[in-house]
Amino acid sequence: MSKISVNIKGFDSQEFPKGITPLQIMNDIKGVPKDTIICKVDGQLTDLSSNLNKNCELQFMDAKSKDGHSVLLHSTAHLMAQAVKRLFPKTKVTIGPFLENRFYYDFDVNSPFTEDDLLEVENEMIKISEENLEISHKVKSRNEALAFFEKIDESYKVEIINDLDKDETLKVYSQGEFTDLCRGPHVHSTGQIKHFKILSSSAAYWRGDEKNQTLQRVYGTSFQNSKDLKKYLQMLEEQKKRDHRKIGKELDLFFFDDEVGPGLPLWTPSGTVLIDELEALAKEKETANGYLRVRTPHLTKGDLFSKSGHLDHYMSSMFSPMDVDGIDYYMKPMNCPYHHKIFANTPKSYRDLPYRISEYGTCYRYEKSGELFGLMRVRSMQMNDGHIYCTAEQFKEEFINVCNLYMEYFKIFGIEKYEMRLSLHDPEGLGDKFIDNPTLWKKTEEDVRNALKGANLKFVESVGDAAFYGPKIDVQVWSSIGREFTLATNQVDFAIPERFDLSYIDKDGSAKTPLCIHRAPLGTHERFIGFLIEHFGGNFPLWLAPKQITILPVSDKFNDYAQQITTDLRTMGLRVSCDNRSEKIGSKIRDAEMQKINIMVIVGEKEVENKTVTVRRRFIKEQKEMSLNDFSDEILSEIKERRVSN
């Protein structure tokens, strides 16, 4: 039998019989961790049961690795689907992908799952795990796969297969009596899936389209050991407490109304304070960085978005046009084309560059009803948008300056963990998902990569996630409880300057095309405020808090003094309320803490006599008597510095 050479990461290169599987190699050599669940062959995730037929690089992986964990999650989704089919045989299975630390599977069932149903499913999953069923796969032709799933009456799988090319070859994975259509890879037995939990269920639409069949989506999670599972479940409990929808309602920050429409948030006075403070911060930072403020309309003729390429590449995320005098008008999904028009409105020379403009522009994007989620996925959003038009020589410095602006914001908000993700195009999507200009893609991506490296900024790369018009930096941040958010973006648009015939006069008198950087360091108000609510748990720092101070008279006879202090502090621009209810002071303090008011100012007989105030910080029992001037100086300084802790 012929031999192949296998270079195993962490081991010496060895020869094995052609056709051997990674699982067999695991059993042949000493030192491979027992908790290995998957492998990479020449950098590609591969089943342990796959045959190796040529010389290769082999790496064994456990579920602690990101790739290994994704495989474990995916395999647990199949385990859950098998349990559901055992308990509810008439159920139709659809799809079951993995997410970040979670998975889900969509089922077509006669009635929604109850809590008892889900507990029964979880118990059945434990039984299947204990059966330690081998998970194997076969490659089938499209017709073979179609015949198989038609025979077992899995109509959703049949629909998926019918949408594929006729010459497509498919994989099916089997474990015991259960077989699923899947690209894989998967763990090699159900016995490797031991530490899991069903989390919740909700309604979903087949293929995300509300016109299609309503399904039951069941979420779950899975980890390599019980310790990691427990830690994740504890984090989920903390997330529930900090859910921006829950806290937003408790603090009366925003709400949605059926008569207004889904995904269209209404901001209350308290929520509007958050918006105003963020805009003031952005204006301050952008002015310091040489940006000019602009304003643009909410709709436009379709011609503008045809020229920009949005109608070709972004139409599915735009609202339907409205007919005005026989012309199609669209609500804007982005501010970019308007900014290009502003740049082109007056002649520019090289002396005018870099030309930086910004605005908080309201955009409208169509999101399917099933994908809307509080402030995180909405249909109306206020975006911290801006564009920089510069020469090729200025590009690197301008791009890095935007990245540095992110760092300034993160420091202000106490965001300690973040990651820059360089999103690149996928060559297979040229002409469809991405503008068809491979030469420009290659050059622009390399320019961005070199700029990041030159500034010693750490980043990871993600193929296929670029904007249709150019590469971009997506900034991932983690809240104080460890949840990941996509927050900001810094994009290079190499197509727009030519599409809009943007130009400037260079030193030699010739017309040149500028480069365009599109940036949104704070993303949208909606998503960023949703993040901040969770990050701070609603306990906003003093400068940002909608309700900064409340004055608490200990009895009615001190109401006049309390009201005078309230008026004095308000004239200083502070957000102050006065609780002059006939309640005990302990009750007033508890109510103020429930409202997450930062500072309680207590006034009674002693304070009136001494012309002072007694100050109590949120959640701190210690109180301090101060003159009103000393108190106001202290808090105004804290607000000016935008301190995170208070």
Regions found by a protein language model. Give the residues of each.
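NTP/phosphate- and nucleic-acid-binding module
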Residues: 1-94, 100-646
